[in-house]
């Protein structure tokens, strides 16, 4: 009886030991499964990083100006555009057309012009350092209109045109049609009125046309000039900081800025990028440095 009971106990123990045993192959499999379970959090971290890498690879040009055109002037290829057909007030960009009309008339550049009461801005009340009675040559008036965006200088140029200011504005619109500007209308030679309108696409044509006038290229990119006004020297500076700063690294052939409250800030240029002439039009830029920042992003 004792032997039978002992034998049964030994068999039971052996049976339990067999059920709980693990072969070497089974142990290895179990360890691999455990390792996989521990590796899962690492794989999730790697997946979260992938979208960030894709965003960094994006080469889209993000510009803040409301309407933009960047065009290769040689081929005519539009390299970038944004709202290029939107018709907007163009402020002092107008003065490029003013200069072309003056030069097309082939009037004597050395002729003395006088700032009159009719040249004072009664629309916006802008200030000027050219007092009524100031006398300067036609070329100096052109310089101040293009470089320093002097409104009285631009107005005086129109009043000293054959037929007066009305004939001058008519000539501006005739010139616009002649160079293929479909969205462009002029009502004054300064750009102070919001009735002077154009599109970024049209302005690429206007800047390109202006670039064929050597004097416009010279005067619009003059950094600064001191003139005798009323018997005392006054320093005038270019309104485009990229022209004034050699450290900017820009090679600019034509430049004009503009601003009116209704339409923000503007910048148009013909510049050399990668050894090619490129026309840049930036319209409706509201930040203080937005147009300059956009130009540098394009570069």
What are these regions (language model features)?
Residues 18-31:
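Signal peptide processing junction and immediate N-terminal pro/mature segment
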Residues 23, 59, 276-278:
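Solvent-exposed, well-ordered amphipathic alpha-helical segments
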């Amino acid at each position: 009886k004792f032997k039978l009971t002992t034998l049964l106990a030994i068999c039971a123990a052996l049976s339990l030991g067999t059920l709980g045993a693990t072969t070497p192959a089974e142990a290895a499999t179990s360890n691999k499964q455990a390792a996989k379970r521990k590796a899962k959090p690492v794989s999730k971290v790697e997946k979260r990083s992938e979208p960030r890498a894709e965003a960094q690879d994006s080469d889209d040009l993000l510009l803040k100006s409301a309407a933009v055109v960047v065009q290769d002037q040689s081929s005519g290829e539009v390299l970038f555009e944004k709202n290029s057909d939107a018709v907007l007030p163009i402020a002092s960009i107008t003065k490029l057309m003013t200069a072309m009309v003056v030069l097309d008339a082939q009037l004597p550049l050395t002729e003395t012009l006088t700032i009159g009461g009719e040249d004072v801005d009664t629309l916006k009340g802008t200030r000027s350092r050219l007092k009524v009675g100031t006398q300067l040559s036609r070329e100096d008036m052109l310089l101040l209109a293009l470089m320093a965006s002097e409104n009285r200088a631009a107005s005086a140029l129109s009043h000293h045109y054959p037929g007066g200011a009305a004939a001058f504005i008519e000539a501006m619109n005739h010139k616009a049609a002649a160079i293929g500007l479909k969205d462009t209308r002029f009502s004054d030679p300064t750009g102070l009125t919001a009735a002077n309108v154009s599109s970024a696409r049209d302005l690429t044509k206007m800047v390109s046309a202006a670039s064929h006038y050597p004097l416009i290229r010279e005067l619009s990119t003059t950094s600064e000039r001191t003139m005798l006004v009323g018997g005392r020297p006054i320093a005038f500076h270019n309104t485009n900081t990229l022209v004034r700063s050699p450290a900017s690294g820009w090679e600019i052939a034509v430049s004009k800025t503009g601003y009116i409250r209704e339409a923000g800030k503007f910048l148009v240029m013909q510049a050399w990028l990668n050894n090619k002439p490129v026309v840049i039009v930036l319209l409706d830029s509201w930040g203080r440095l937005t147009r300059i920042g956009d130009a540098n992003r394009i570069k």
